[in-house]
C-alpha cells in the first residue's frame, strides 16, 4: 500500500511528543501500525511501547492488523490495551500492595442501576424526597451524574457545578455519597471504577506515582478526542518524564461529552500537559468524494472549539452524490431503494441513522414494501420492548394476548407459557412501568397469561405492594386502563386503542424520554395503517 506524504511524516517522527489531527477515513490506523513497526525496526523493545485504545473492538482489530503486518519478521508486537484493561492491571497491582481493597468486579449494567436505585431510595427516605427521585428519568439522571464523577478527579460538588446539572437535582450529590457507601459495604467495583480508583490512589500516594511512571519509552493513543479527565491523568502518570506520547484523533468527532470527553483535550490541553508537541495532520479521506468532503467542511466550520484542518477527498476516490429530500407521508427512501434495485443489489446499499430511534420509521417503511434489510447493532423494531408493548395492547383488545390459547385456569406451570407471550406481557407491564420488582412482575405476567380476561383485576391486587400512595394510585389507574382496553370491541382500530392508552397514561412522556420518535410514529397517519395491518399478525 502506497502511503501519503502526511502518513510518512508521522511514521518517521523522531523525538518528543506528537499530536495527529486526522479527518475521517484518512488511514490513521495504517499510519499508527506503520509507526509501531518503524519503532520496532529501529530497535525499540516491545515492552517499551504501549498502544492505548478506547474500546475492546478497536483494540482487537488494531492488534490483529499489527500482528499481520509483522508476519514474516522476527519482530514481536507491543502491548495493545484499552484504558480500562490498563486500569484493571493497576487495580490488581495496587490490591496486591494493599493500596486498594480487594473488591469483586461487577460488569452488568443492571447491577449498577440496582445499587443506584437503592442509594436513591435510602437517601430519599432520609431527605423526604418525592417519587420523581426514583422514577426512570430520575435514576437515569443519577446514573449520568455517577458516570461524570467517575470520569473526573474533582469532587461530586465540583462536577455537579461544572457539568451544568439543574439545581433541583442537587440531591444527586448526597445520594452519590450513599451510593459509594453501599458500594464499599458490598465490596464491589464497577467498570468505571477501574480507572477512577487507581488514579485517585496515585493522587493520594506519591510513591504510587513514582512506581507507575517511566517504564515506557513510547505511548500511542488512538481516538484521543474521546479522552476524559481521569483518563488524561492516567496517561500523565504512566508517561512520567520518560515516555514520548503520540495521540491521534479528530476534534470534529468528539461526541462523548456526556461521559466527560471535551474538544479542549486535543485542541489545547495535550500541548499543555505534554509540552511542545509536533503537530501533524492527516487531511485526505479515502472514503468519499469531493462534494461530501466540501459539505462536511462547511457544516463543521460552525464548531468553534476545533483546529483549522480541511477534509480533502483523495483524487482517486469515487464520486459521492448528495441529494436532500423532504420527509413527507411517504418515506423517500423507498423510491431510492426501488430504483437502486433495478441496477444493483441491496447488499451494496446502507442506511445510516444518527440514533437507533430514527431507524424505526425506516424499518416500518421497508417492512411495508417488503424490502429485506438487516439491522446492525440494535434490536429490530418488533423486538424492542416499546413496540412489543404497543402490539401487546392491540392483542389485549383482540382477546389474543395469549396466542397459544384462551384463558386457562388449570395451567400452573411456567413451562406451559409461551416465551414470546411472556416477553410481550412483561413489556406491557413496564411501558408504562408499574415499578414492581422484577420477580413480582414475572409472577404477575404468568398469572395474566393464565387468565388474560382478568388482567385488570390481577394488576389491581398488587396495589398494596407499591410502597407509596403515588405508586398505588398509578397501579390502580393502569389496572383500569387494562380493563378498558380489554372491554373494547376486537374490531376497534389500532389508532383508537393506542390513542386511548396514550391519552390516559403518561406513555407519551415515557416514550419521549427513551424513544423520542415512537409516538410521532404511532400517531402518523401513514403508520396507523401499518399497525392495523400488523394487528392480525
Task: Please describe what each predicted stretch is.
Residues 229-326:
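Conserved RecA-like helicase ATPase core segment
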Residues 45-58, 78, 222, 248, ...:
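Conserved RecA-like ASCE P-loop NTPase motor core of nucleic-acid helicases/translocases
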Residues 86, 272, 316-320, 343-491:
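ATPase/helicase motor core of nucleic-acid motors
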Residues 1-99, 210, 240, 294-297:
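P-loop NTPase Walker
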Residues 465-523:
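C-terminal extensions
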Residues 1-22, 26, 30-31, 48-50, ...:
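Accessory N-terminal region flanking or inserted into the helicase ATPase core
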Residues 44-48, 69-78, 94-108, 120-134, ...:
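Short, polar/flexible loop-turn hinges at active-site or ligand-entry regions and domain interfaces
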Residues 208-209, 408-414, 456-457, 508-537:
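Conserved C-terminal motor-coupling region of P-loop helicases
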Amino acid at each position: 500500500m502506497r502511503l501519503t506524504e502526511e502518513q510518512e511524516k508521522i511514521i518517521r517522527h523522531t523525538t518528543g511528543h506528537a499530536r495527529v489531527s486526522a479527518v475521517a477515513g484518512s488511514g490513521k490506523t495504517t499510519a499508527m501500525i506503520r509507526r509501531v513497526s518503524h519503532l520496532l525496526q529501529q530497535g525499540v523493545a516491545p515492552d517499551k511501547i504501549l498502544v492505548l485504545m478506547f474500546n475492546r473492538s478497536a483494540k482487537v482489530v488494531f492488534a490483529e492488523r499489527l500482528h499481520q503486518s509483522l508476519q514474516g519478521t522476527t519482530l514481536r508486537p507491543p502491548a495493545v490495551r484499552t484504558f480500562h484493561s490498563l486500569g484493571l492491571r493497576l487495580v490488581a497491582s495496587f490490591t496486591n500492595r494493599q493500596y486498594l481493597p480487594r473488591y469483586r468486579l461487577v460488569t452488568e449494567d443492571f447491577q449498577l442501576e440496582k445499587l443506584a436505585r437503592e442509594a436513591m431510595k435510602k437517601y430519599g427516605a432520609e431527605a423526604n424526597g418525592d417519587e420523581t427521585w426514583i422514577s426512570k428519568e430520575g435514576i437515569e439522571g443519577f446514573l449520568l451524574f455517577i458516570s461524570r464523577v467517575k470520569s473526573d478527579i474533582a469532587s461530586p460538588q465540583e462536577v455537579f457545578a461544572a457539568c451544568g446539572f439543574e439545581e433541583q437535582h442537587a440531591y444527586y450529590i448526597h445520594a452519590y455519597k450513599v451510593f459509594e457507601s453501599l458500594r464499599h459495604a458490598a465490596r464491589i467495583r464497577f467498570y468505571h471504577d477501574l480507572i477512577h480508583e487507581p488514579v485517585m490512589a496515585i493522587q493520594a500516594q506519591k510513591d504510587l506515582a513514582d512506581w507507575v511512571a517511566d517504564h515506557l519509552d513510547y505511548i500511542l493513543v488512538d481516538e484521543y478526542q474521546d479522552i476524559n479527565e481521569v483518563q488524561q491523568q492516567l496517561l500523565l502518570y504512566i508517561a512520567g518524564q520518560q515516555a514520548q506520547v503520540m495521540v491521534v484523533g479528530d476534534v470534529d468527532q468528539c461526541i462523548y461529552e456526556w461521559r466527560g470527553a471535551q474538544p479542549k483535550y486535543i485542541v489545547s490541553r495535550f500541548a499543555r500537559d505534554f509540552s511542545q508537541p509536533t503537530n501533524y495532520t492527516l487531511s485526505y479521506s479515502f472514503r468519499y468524494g469531493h462534494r461530501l468532503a466540501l459539505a462536511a467542511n462547511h457544516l463543521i466550520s460552525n464548531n468553534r472549539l476545533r483546529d483549522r484542518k480541511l477534509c480533502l477527498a483523495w483524487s482517486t476516490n469515487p464520486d459521492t452524490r448528495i441529494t436532500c429530500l423532504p420527509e413527507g407521508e411517504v418515506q423517500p427512501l423507498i423510491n431510492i431503494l426501488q430504483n437502486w434495485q433495478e441496477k444493483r443489489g441491496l447488499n451494496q446499499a446502507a442506511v445510516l441513522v444518527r440514533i437507533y430511534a430514527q431507524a424505526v420509521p425506516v424499518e416500518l417503511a421497508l417492512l411495508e414494501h417488503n424490502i429485506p434489510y438487516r439491522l446492525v447493532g440494535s434490536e429490530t423494531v418488533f423486538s424492542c420492548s416499546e413496540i412489543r408493548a404497543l402490539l401487546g395492547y392491540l392483542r389485549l383488545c383482540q382477546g389474543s394476548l395469549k396466542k397459544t390459547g384462551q384463558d386457562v385456569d388449570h395451567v400452573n406451570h411456567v413451562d406451559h407459557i409461551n416465551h414470546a407471550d411472556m416477553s410481550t406481557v412483561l413489556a406491557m407491564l413496564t411501558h408504562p412501568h408499574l415499578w414492581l420488582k422484577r420477580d413480582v412482575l414475572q409472577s404477575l405476567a404468568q398469572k395474566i397469561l393464565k387468565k388474560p380476561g382478568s388482567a385488570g383485576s390481577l394488576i389491581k391486587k398488587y396495589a398494596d405492594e407499591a410502597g407509596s400512595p403515588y405508586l398505588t394510585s398509578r397501579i390502580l389507574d393502569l389496572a383500569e386502563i387494562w380493563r378498558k382496553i380489554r372491554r373494547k370491541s376486537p374490531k376497534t382500530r389500532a389508532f383508537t386503542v393506542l390513542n386511548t392508552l396514550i391519552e390516559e397514561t403518561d406513555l407519551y412522556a415515557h416514550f419521549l424520554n427513551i424513544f423520542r420518535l415512537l409516538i410521532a410514529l404511532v400517531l402518523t397517519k401513514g403508520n396507523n395503517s401499518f399497525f392495523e395491518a400488523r394487528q392480525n399478525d
